[in-house]
Amino acid sequence: MNLNNNDFITIGNKDESDLIIIWFHGYGSNNWSFEPTLKVINMQMNEAAYIIMPNAPLVNDKRSWYPLPTKDENNQLLEDYQGLQASVHAIDNFIDGLNLDVDMKLIIGGFSQGAALALSMSFSSRHKICGCAALSGYMPCAKIYEKHDISVMDIFMSHGYEDKAIEYDAFQKSLKFLENKTDNIITSVGNFGHTINQQVVNDLASWFGQRIK
């Protein structure tokens, strides 16, 4: 992944925060897409977080964190694990360049493809991460990660019953997979599509806040 390490936006005050959050947007979107929501969440947390939102590189005129899955001639899903790992490595290098306080708690999170990236980093990032928030996403390359230990034990997941982009069944399979890796999973689900609602916002803000304590 050819990531521009200077292309990111932030919320909050780095020097006055108790928590660092790195947030990954969805496929075809950009880092401004969740900025309003994350501002509201940080307000609910009394501005306790410093939030960093990088931009995925453009691939065929759409921003993408890693190679999208394809299907073979038998309609079987093909996932590019090496491409995904290259993206995780690029994000690790991005985090290195931020020169963050190593004593600060670090959370990763994202929406849709960004959520999938965050979940994969929960297994393979070289950084110490205390939590992962995955909204409307899925567990990529689960067959390979089945052989790996998870390093991030606290996970927040949300999904809508009516999601057509990443169907609820994919969430259920991902949740079942992750429950075999950790007992510390909080979920927030409801009657919505490939988006989030106010309940998810409130639940996520509460979960973030608990990571500070």
Label every PLM stretch briefly.
Residues N2-M104:
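Serine-hydrolase catalytic machinery in alpha/beta-hydrolase-like enzymes
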Residues W32, K164-A170:
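Conserved alpha/beta-hydrolase "acid-adjacent" motif
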Residues P36, S120-S124:
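Active-site signature of alpha/beta-hydrolase-fold catalytic machinery across serine-
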Residues I108-G110, L135:
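Short beta-strand immediately N-terminal to the catalytic nucleophile in serine-hydrolase-like folds
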Residues G110-G114, A118:
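Gly/Ala-rich beta-loop-alpha elbow adjacent to hydrolase catalytic centers
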Residues H127-M139:
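A conserved short beta-strand
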Residues F156, D169-K213:
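C-terminal catalytic histidine-bearing segment of alpha/beta-hydrolase fold enzymes
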Residues F156-H159, D163:
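Short beta-strand/loop motif that positions the catalytic acidic residue
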